[in-house]
C-alpha cells in the first residue's frame, strides 16, 4: 500500500465480489473515511474530500445518488484508476500539477469530464491548447558520459532506444555504401523519435566505442542490440562495412514497447511472457544474454578471405 497525499492507494486488482446498493445520506462528511475500488485500484479517502467541490462524487456521497458496494464495503466505481489519485488531490487542494505528456493530459481530461470536476477540466483543456501552440516538441538527449547514460536509463519510466554512431572510431576505409547506410540509420532514428517520443526515451551517443549500433532497454536494462558494422576483406585490404538492418530495427523498437508501463502499474508481465520478453524468461536471462553477445560478436567479425589467403590454403 502506498501513501498518496492524504489518500491511500493499492494498485492491485481485486476479485469480483457480491455487490449491493447503498446510500451515504446523513453520513458525517468531516470524519468518515470511505474505501473506493476504482477499476481495481483501491483508495482510502475522507467524505470531506469527496464532497468538498460540486462534482459527481459529491452527488454520490451526499445521498443524491446510490452507490454500489461489495461484501467488504468497498465502493465500486467502474472507471480506470490510473488518474483517480490526481482527481482526489485536486478535490482536496484545488490545484494539482498536470502530467507532461499530451496523452496523459487527455486521459486526465476524460476522467475530469466523467466526474464533473469543472476546474480540473478547464485546466486540462488549457494545457492541451498550449501544447497545440508549441508541439510537436521532441527532446533527444545526447549523452556526455557512460554514467550519464546509465542514470538516464535507470531513472526513466519509459523503455529506451539508443543510437551510437561515431565515424571517427573506424581504423579502415569504408565500403562504397557505408556512408549512405550510416545516414539511413540516423534518419530512421530521427523518424522513430518523432513518432514515439511520448512513449520511448530516445538517446544519442556520439562518444562510444562503436561506429553504428542500436541498443534497446526495458525496465532499466539492455534487452537487445543491433550492431550495424563489420570488417570485411572485399578488396586487398580491410574495410569497414556499415549496414542498414531496417526490418530488425523496427522489430526491436516494437518489442521494446512491451516494456511500456500499463496504467501506471508497470509492463504487462503476462504479455511479455507470451511474446518471449525478458520478464517471462528471467530464469534463462544470463544464458540468453551470453548467446546474444556471442551472436553480435560473430556478426561484427564477418571475414571474407582474400584471394591470396585462399591460394595459401591450397598449397
Swiss-Prot record:
Single GO MF descriptor: Notch binding
Subunit and partners: Homotetramer; forms a two-fold symmetric tetramer in solution. Interacts with CUL3; interaction is direct and forms a 5:5 heterodecamer. Component of the BCR(BACURD3) E3 ubiquitin ligase complex, at least composed of CUL3, KCTD10/BACURD3 and RBX1. Interacts with DNA polymerase delta subunit 2/POLD2. Interacts with PCNA.
Primary location recorded for the protein, binned into one broad class: nucleus
Tissue localization of expression: Expressed at highest levels in lung. Also detected in testis and heart. Very low expression, if any, in brain, liver, spleen, kidney and skeletal muscle.
Localization in the cell: Nucleus
Induction: By tumor necrosis factor/TNF in cells.
CDD domains to which the protein is assigned, alphabetical: BTB_POZ_KCTD10_BACURD3
Physiological role: Substrate-specific adapter of a BCR (BTB-CUL3-RBX1) E3 ubiquitin-protein ligase complex. The BCR(BACURD3) E3 ubiquitin ligase complex mediates the ubiquitination of target proteins, leading to their degradation by the proteasome.
Disordered: region residues: 269-294
Pathway given in the UniProt record: Protein modification; protein ubiquitination
Protein name (record): BTB/POZ domain-containing adapter for CUL3-mediated RhoA degradation protein 3
GO CC terms of this entry: Cul3-RING ubiquitin ligase complex; MKS complex; nucleus
Domain of life: Eukaryota
